[in-house]
Amino acid sequence: MGLENGIVLQVGGKIDPDAAILKVPGIEKVDWYDNPEPGFTYYDICYWRKYWNIRDILFDNCHAKESNHAYPLTIKQLESIRDDIYYLICDGEDQWDTSRAMWSFEDSVGRLGWDIVRISELIRYLKTDVGYCEAFFYDSY
């Protein structure tokens, strides 16, 4: 099972430093993304380590079949991922399956709430005319 997965934004060039997406806590430029394409900048939107329940949500929404890959995400898929994470939180601690995440519900709920905010801002950003940009789900094992 994938140990690290997340959502990254690939942008041709750079984002305007005053863009709202860069004001959201936790969205940061990253230099570590595997196989970067020249001329592109990458931003970490969400990162999950040992959250197999979140990985399942991502795999289901992008119809991923193999780990250790990057999968492009549409706005519709991002909306579905965001909603699924919201419902995971709403289900509450009683429904939190500790075998599907290394972290407790109590340790996760605030972080997942911020993930919903970051994904929502990513969706807003992608809906604007910002030039070339694309969101990816990455899975590494």
Name every feature range the model reports, one short phrase each.
Residues 135:
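Active-site regions of oxyanion-processing enzymes, predominantly non-cytosolic
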